[in-house]
Amino acid sequence: MARQDLGFPLSMRQAHRYQPMVPSSSSILSPAVRSLPREASLSGVTPSSGGLSISRQGSLAAGGDDVVQFFSTTFYVKETEKARAVVRVVRIGTLQGPCSVEWRTEDSSAQKGKKYKEAKGTIDFGPGESVRSVEVEILDDDSFDSTLDFLVLLENASNCVIDPEGRQCVVMIMDDDIFPSNAFEEELEQQSEDLLYEVGWSLLRAFMWFCYEHVPEIAKKSVAMLLMSMLGNAYYLGTIFIRVYLVDTVLNNTDPSTESRLWFPGDRDSTAVALGLAWILPNFILLGSDWFEMKKLEMGFNIRYHLRVNLFRKYLNYTDKSVSAVPLQDLKISMMEDIPELVSQGYLIIFELWAMMGKIICIAYFMLRKHPFSAIPLFVYPLLIMLYLHFTYTQRLQLMAKEGEGQSATTGTVMQLHKAQGLIQAYGASGYVVHHFEKILRNQRSLTMQLKTFEFWNSQLIPWITLLAIGIYMSLASRVVLHGHTSLGSFLATINVYKDLGDRFSTVLRGFTSLSKSISPLCGLTLQFSLEVDVPARADCFKRREAFALSWIQVQRGRKISMDDIPIVFQDVCVDYSPCMNSATGGLTAHAPQGSIIQIAGPHDSGKGIVLSLLCDALPPSSGSVLVSPHLHLLNVPHVPLFMGSVGVFGNIHVISDAGEYSPAMYARGLRMLQRLRLDKPWIKEMYDSEARALREAAERMGHGSPESKFWCYEEDDDGNNEDEEEEEEEYNPWINRLSTSEKWRLQLARAFLHNPHVLALTRPVQELDEDLRQVILSCFQEFVTARGLDMDHLDVAHRRPRTVIFTTGATDQYDIADYVWRVSPSSGVTVEKRPPRRV
């Protein structure tokens, strides 16, 4: 087994031969500064002398030059009852004398009062203390959320300096609740859509309750909608009686008794005018109600926005297995079709059904009051609808699932064509691809027609029942009217009511059919929301790293060292399929000191990239541990350049498109980086300047009170429905094709330098460059390490954390800048060579 000796004391090497355990807080940490309720202010908390302490003399000046930052940029906590997020803050420097820093929480995707309790306070470091902690109380609920987070910020330092890159951390709340309800945990264990179909109506009820209870503003808007729908029903009932009154009283001049029943006794003309006004004027109230509903109570956007954001956030945290289970075309269909369909047919439809049921109640009241015998269809319609839905439920969902699969296949083929168009043309496969696409389209057409045929016969049920009911009632006209069982006005009104009743029950059937249709996208979304995410694995990794760093500090207490001296440790690491780190070659055990340059040299396919993947948590080891202090930010830069096609040079190297993030310093540093890496061609600079100018102008507009919405991509037009609009094609960006292979790589490297990670891991960064460019890149690596960052002017070098570069090369390549060379060989595993001190 290859091991590395970097000159550390024996006690330190031995300390890393075992998996570090977290020491008890009572043994190494002073009592935590806890986020108590506001009435118990934290500002007066005084740490005890038993705090965790390490010292470092000579690297920083005493007193106010000590640096304070968060122990990690990300902390994790489970959303369980009485959970508290523990957030650690570290002090780096001489540790001489006291210092303090204020802290506070701030909303991000998680909101105070809903997911956590707002807290703030002051952290006091005593002489020799290097690690302190605060706690934030997490609020547990039974409602599903994808992983939400909030911020904790440091500010107002006293006798110390806050590292700008470590002044803010994210606390991720791991929600273990299930969408849309925890009641379906058993069905989701098998990840079967068929099992969800069996409980589809229960799932739909849970979704409705989820929207009502959990989506912001929906509860009060829903109640308002239900109440306002009753206005229309009241008007509808009034119009029925107006028509009966008009025929039986106002127009019945043969019956003298009607004179006394006129609104204006003895004046039929005035009464008729009053009836006309009674028919017209309430519509102004209904118009105002409709306007208020459209302007203030539009709920579709709120629910769609909530579901889309949660699914988007969930997808970003998917494991590789989960990503493979949800192809990109399925995600697109879920976002742009399934969610709008679910919201429209699975929640908003209930208000239409509520209004229709109200009208049916009005009709029932009229029928039972005027002619009870005519109310028989009131009982026939619901019975037939329930039986029909019961017997067609499964068939409908099966047809919808097949039609959805056909649509997914068509969309997926088009998306694959977009990616592989050049390859298809180069190898003359266009004919085969077109034939295959035609076959997919024919299959989709067949599936669509099956569903349409089914829906056609669905739509015939209520109209035919209504036709029969009216015909039978008309055949009884002579007996009903002439024998005095009802008046002519009531009889004619009942004929109209029968037609209205059929229309209402047709709407009810369509509504319940829509509800049953919504179960299909709901089941699909439920499965996507339940897929595994990598946040728990990242949380476990963070705990191991935190335990390692705290254990290392405990072992090294009093040795005049700081967190800058915590190495990166590969401890008996084996990967079964790795050519160089399997059980036969003995795995890898090595220490990588911060502030060093490490070259991983070896032939092709020897496993060099696996080392970088292990380092950056992209790959779990089969055995052993990779231990890294959590305060280190690691960035793995792949050999294949990655770009965002929707933005240009500026957006790609700074990874921003929001004007609020733009600053002149950002522009200047990016420009210097492009010049250093020989990326200063006129057209590149012109594009860079053009993007920067647009962002600067947008920022100026924001400063003048015209802020651009951060959620512009989700905004809709005035009618609240942009789902049916044709999607705009993304504008093609040919600038990427103008870059050479070398320029693409250097642009990616510029992005990495600008984001200034503590550990920069690169795959073959100089492999395909000429000698001149190779030296440019290597000199940048060297300055990045020695100056603790490249082209950074906002913080003195003494206040920056060390930078480390680990890069892979061919087996025979040798570079003087490397402090250590890890030689990778399938036959001998990994051997470590210490190089002579690098030339600065």
Regions picked out by a protein language model, each given a short descriptive name:
Residues 1-208:
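Short boundary segments that mark the start of a structured unit
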Residues 21, 26, 30, 43-46, ...:
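Membrane-integrated ABC transporters
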Residues 230, 351-400, 475-486:
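Transmembrane helices of ABC transporter permease
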Residues 256-260, 366-380, 450-523, 624:
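Helix-loop-helix
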Residues 309, 650-734, 778-782, 786-787:
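ABC ATPase nucleotide-binding domain helical subdomain, centered on the C-loop/LSGGQ "ABC signature"
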Residues 316-360, 419-422:
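Juxtamembrane loop-to-helix connectors within ABC transporter transmembrane domains
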Residues 402, 406, 410, 422-429, ...:
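Cytosolic ends of transmembrane helices, especially the final helix of ABC transmembrane type-1 domains
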Residues 593, 597, 601-668, 672, ...:
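ABC ATPase nucleotide-binding domain signature region
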